[in-house]
From Swiss-Prot:
This is C-X-C chemokine receptor type 5. One of its GO terms (molecular function) is C-C chemokine receptor activity. One of its GO terms (biological process) is G protein-coupled receptor signaling pathway. InterPro entries: CCR1-9-like, Chemokine_CXCR5, GPCR_Rhodpsn, GPCR_Rhodpsn_7TM. Expression in mature B-cells and Burkitt lymphoma cells. GO terms for cellular component: external side of plasma membrane; plasma membrane. Glycans are attached at residues 28, 196. It is a multi-pass membrane protein. Residues 1-55, 110-124, 189-219, 281-304 are extracellular. The keyword Glycoprotein applies. It comes from the Eukaryota. Keywords: B-cell activation, Cell membrane, Disulfide bond, G-protein coupled receptor, Glycoprotein, Membrane, Receptor, Transducer, Transmembrane, Transmembrane helix.
Amino acid sequence: MNYPLTLEMDLENLEDLFWELDRLDNYNDTSLVENHLCPATEGPLMASFKAVFVPVAYSLIFLLGVIGNVLVLVILERHRQTRSSTETFLFHLAVADLLLVFILPFAVAEGSVGWVLGTFLCKTVIALHKVNFYCSSLLLACIAVDRYLAIVHAVHAYRHRRLLSIHITCGTIWLVGFLLALPEILFAKVSQGHHNNSLPRCTFSQENQAETHAWFTSRFLYHVAGFLLPMLVMGWCYVGVVHRLRQAQRRPQRQKAVRVAILVTSIFFLCWSPYHIVIFLDTLARLKAVDNTCKLNGSLPVAITMCEFLGLAHCCLNPMLYTFAGVKFRSDLSRLLTKLGCTGPASLCQLFPSWRRSSLSESENATSLTTF
């Protein structure tokens, strides 16, 4: 008796069908791995984490990020005429962080009720997320190059010409960040999951082969242009800077001035490298370059959510770093808070009484807001 399809062909067709559904639904409920169905990837623990911890944590990051980065912008703007090149880059970095924290309320709302704000706002939020991530990494790379040229090669220029080149560089960075994020902006759309209880999501559309290729292109740009190349540039520059500063021990002030840039870069690496590792692993799984086991398929969504939270927390860490590390910045922050009425014994100004002592003793020799 002849059958039109063999059992082996049926299994292969069934596997292809489930793999396609799994790709389109972004690991939502079930997937076929190694010829058997995996259980649901989002258990009660993950559901509780998304429902309780994520809104609270993102709200805290939002508040700290807005307050901290606004204070950084106000202080740096007050010294606009005397800002160094590094501080100009840090000003734009604070702008990028501030814009990035504005997407957090949208992320919390999407996790609770799905995306209900339409395609235009979907593309806008994706643009804010990706553009500002690219700009943050590129600005940190520019800070590293700027310190490398100034310290290792002693490159100096007339102030007005140097500031003009810095502003042109910052404008170029924002343009490059937008161009790198363009694939995600163009293909972002609101899509409904394939399951009855799925919420609408703002995602990268992968409904055809061209969109899938664009998705892999955006992932490649995200890994290489957004993280790997900037980190290589930063590492190369700061190795040269540290080597040079060890030879020039008679300039301790210059050694202190470069520490904040290295610390900012280190915090960026520590916050974003775990996310890039799990996203890269997710990319390999989708390319079938690694065995897509049920364990991996169930662990990736949890790891991505946790590591993304760590990366977004970076938005509120830089202002804290400037406050605890920068002598002159700390002094200016103390004066600003005093003008705002921060004078009582229980005020924020009294939480760290050593601030004023260290600021008075060291700020006279500080020529930069980011000097230690």
